[in-house]
Design a protein with these regions (language model features):
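C-terminal active-site/capping subdomain that shapes the small-molecule cofactor and substrate pocket
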Residues: 183-271
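One-carbon transfer enzymes
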Residues: 1-191, 201, 238-241, 247, ...
Length: 271
């Protein structure tokens, strides 16, 4: 949906329509005989899946001669699941990447065909998503011509981790965590779902921050400084220095601008 909450076609569909490629958008696949018969009738050599988020039924996996392959946004077997990009940032990994894999009946458990990596540095979820999208397309184009002869590498299930689907409520900040983890979560959830805390009964979205390697004896969530261009908040470990904020119904703004028209009392506990 766009910002007016109206349904908007995904870019892939828009481009497919421009090229005259048939587009099918079933809500469910498993028992949709019309859809399944259409896919079977295409007599495809390979099915490519990207950002689908659901497990394909065995019937579909067995249709193409060369199988179904998935472009997954992590270095498998780490971060199987729906939100691998955000998980890699939150967990503090130094790098992440793309894995081209043969699809199996399990969730992201198939043999790995190709990988490409990139450093995470201080990237946001959106920045990393955009970078991995390009990497994934390039890696796919290098992999497809060799697909018939490629021998996949089995995943070591002992090294697997899971990245569950994200919801809006996951953006509610838990200040008992370390400042470093909270800052990583803020980057991972930028722009969606965003991270937020409550000041009395008002929700504030905390958009950008850095960490201070200082100790505080205040309760986690306590505002210990709010002046100039920052708001400092005590955490389970360290201090979170917020530099960009968003009030309800307003655009995101630098804390310096926010504090010109708003005040936050020292000692206020954000929840």
């Amino acid at each position: 949906r766009d910002r007016g909450r109206k349904r908007k076609a995904p870019p892939v569909k828009e481009r497919a329509v421009e090229l005259g490629i048939p587009v099918l958008q079933p809500e469910k696949i498993g028992k949709n005989r019309e859809f399944l018969d259409t896919i079977r009738g295409a007599d495809a050599d390979v099915i490519v899946v990207a950002a689908y988020g659901r497990i394909l039924p065995k019937e579909v996996l067995e249709m193409p001669a060369l199988g179904c392959i998935n472009i997954h946004g992590s270095l498998l077997p780490r971060f199987r699941g729906a939100a691998p990009i955000q998980a890699a940032i939150i967990e503090g990994d130094e790098e992440t990447g793309i894995t081209i894999m043969k699809m199996a009946e399990g969730l992201d458990t198939g043999d790995m065909l190709a990988k490409a990596s990139t450093p995470i540095d201080g990237k946001t979820g959106q920045q990393l998503h955009d970078e991995l999208s390009v990497m994934g397309a390039e890696l796919l184009m290098r992999t497809l011509p060799e697909l018939a002869s490629l021998e996949g590498e089995k995943q070591d299930d002992r090294l697997s981790t899971y990245a569950p689907m994200i919801s809006k409520k996951d953006g509610h900040i838990d200040f008992s965590q370390t400042a470093a983890r909270i800052e990583r979560t803020m980057r991972a959830f930028d722009p969606w779902p965003g991270t937020y805390a409550y000041c009395s009964d008002k929700m504030l979205k905390l958009r950008k921050a850095e960490t201070l390697d200082k100790a505080s004896d205040k309760e986690p969530g306590t505002v210990i400084e709010a002046e100039g261009d920052h708001i400092d908040i005590s955490c389970g470990e360290g201090i979170l220095r917020v530099t960009e904020i968003q009030a309800p119904g307003r655009k995101r703004a630098a804390v310096k601008e926010y504090l010109k028209g708003n005040s936050i009392e020292i000692g206020t506990v954000l929840g």
